[in-house]
């Protein structure tokens, strides 16, 4: 994927209410991986697929006692799309409303983005 293509993807994300989160932020909040597409449960493991979509869900409420600035924290989720052998990826972040962890809604959002990339830039590369 070229930089021009990446800019096109980013424009699509902004138009559709996604926020580009850049590099992942690691903290001590309770979190877990929720795999939507591709191979491998943990995206940081060696030998993972060159192309996959995976979802990281953080329950920040479990972290509030460590940081008073997180008084209003709820649950957030990010969708990562690993696109190239150089591990360039886009991280999509969005807050989950209420106190529900709606994995179906997250998966739908990830799938819609997956379809956009595949339709515009071709099928994922084979391993």
Regions found by a protein language model. Give the residues of each.
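Negatively charged, low-complexity tracts enriched in Asp/Glu with abundant Ser/Thr
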Residues: 1-47
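Ampiphathic alpha-helical segments that act as solvent-exposed interaction surfaces
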Residues: 5, 9-10, 84-127
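Assembly/interface hotspot detector across virion components, adhesins/toxins, and nucleic-acid enzymes
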Residues: 18-20, 24-25, 79, 94-96, ...
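Selective for proline/serine-rich intrinsically disordered segments
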Residues: 22, 41, 66, 122-123
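Generic low-complexity segments that are intrinsically disordered, proline-rich and/or Lys/Arg-biased
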Residues: 25, 44, 69, 125-126
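Intrinsically disordered, low-complexity regulatory segments enriched in Ser/Thr/Pro
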Residues: 42-105
């Amino acid at each position: 994927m070229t930089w021009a293509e990446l800019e096109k993807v980013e424009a699509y994300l902004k138009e559709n209410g996604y926020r580009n989160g850049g590099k992942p932020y690691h903290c001590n909040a309770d979190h877990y991986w929720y795999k939507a597409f591709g191979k491998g449960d943990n995206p940081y493991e060696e030998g993972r697929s060159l192309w996959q979509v995976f979802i990281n869900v953080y329950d920040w409420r479990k972290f509030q006692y460590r940081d008073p600035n997180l008084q209003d924290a709820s649950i957030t989720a990010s969708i990562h799309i690993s696109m190239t052998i150089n591990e360039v990826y886009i991280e999509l972040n969005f807050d989950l409303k209420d106190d529900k962890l709606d994995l179906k809604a997250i998966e739908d959002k990830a799938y819609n983005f997956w379809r956009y990339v595949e339709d515009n830039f071709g099928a994922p590369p084979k391993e």
